[in-house]
Amino acid sequence: MAISAQQVKELRERSGAGMMECKTVLTEAEGDMEAAIDLLRARGLAKADKKASRVAAEGVIVTALSEDQKRGVVLEVNCETDFVAKNEDFLALAKDCAGQALAQGLKDAEALLADAGVEERRKGLVSKLGENISLRRLQHLQVMDGVIGAYVHGSRIGVLVALEGQAATSELGRDVAMHVAAARPEVIHPGEVSPERLNREKEILITQAADSGKPADIIEKMISGRLNKLLNEIALTGQPFVKDPDRSVGQLIQSFPGVEVLEFVRFEVGEGIEKAPTADFATEVMAQVRGS
């Protein structure tokens, strides 16, 4: 039977698939729109599965907070290119998934992907956009009597901070989260640095100080001073506050009686993902010539 341009247009709008694909499945389905959609979904899912092996190291970080700001989630959703990372449908998927995770109290990305509707939507978007899409990681923070602070920088860095204490405010939560985004602390307090890390850093400092030729007692003081400086550089409470470097984050928090940082999490798009090497233009051309 003849397939009209209007039918093709409707199927394209409903599915996001290409014009020729829509015309083909409409012909096979003899004009049955729902059957054609099922055919596209089946073929789209197959395409999505093939793309799953491709490296997805671009993407976005999104956060979601409950109305009382006592719960929050941060989610990383990856794709292959910066172009798709700015796509409205991709961004909507990320935002909706974060909202769903918050509403359902989900603790990790695996729990989110266990939802058949989420996985179906992800695979449908893979088919539509032509790139592998991954809900890579999710973390959920909660406080009993305080606030969760959230900050997202350029969709590429996202932070949640759990502040416990009645005096904690939304502004303080956001400020501390912003600081974490910028300063990359590794722990909350200097005392949380592992003994192994301390010993490793101390050995490095001893080696460096030994070359100075100074007396042993002076070297010991040098090592102690440098080690304390290092601890304050990697611990949140010891770092100079980004909005007011004349005081530390610890001093900022102390100005809010009874408030303490329980936990923080910082996600950055693609961190820890080994990207596939990109060949330069000349190499790509040579590969094509040799393959022809």
From Swiss-Prot:
| One Pfam family hit | EF_TS
- Alphabetic keyword roster: Cytoplasm, Elongation factor, Protein biosynthesis
Task: Report if keyword Transcription is assigned.
Answer: no
Involved in Mg(2+) ion dislocation from EF-Tu: region residues? 81-84
Major subcellular site: cytoplasm
Molecular function as annotated in GO: translation elongation factor activity
The question of whether Calcium is a record keyword is answered with no
**CDD domains linked:** UBA_EF-Ts
Q: Where in the cell is it found?
A: Cytoplasm
> Got a GO cellular component term for this one?
cytoplasm
Q: Which family does it belong to?
A: Belongs to the EF-Ts family.
Give the protein's function: Associates with the EF-Tu.GDP complex and induces the exchange of GDP to GTP. It remains bound to the aminoacyl-tRNA.EF-Tu.GTP complex up to the GTP hydrolysis stage on the ribosome.
What this protein is called in its record is Elongation factor Ts
Question: Source species, please?
Answer: Acidithiobacillus ferrooxidans (strain ATCC 23270 / DSM 14882 / CIP 104768 / NCIMB 8455) (Ferrobacillus ferrooxidans (strain ATCC 23270))
Q: Which gene encodes it?
A: tsf
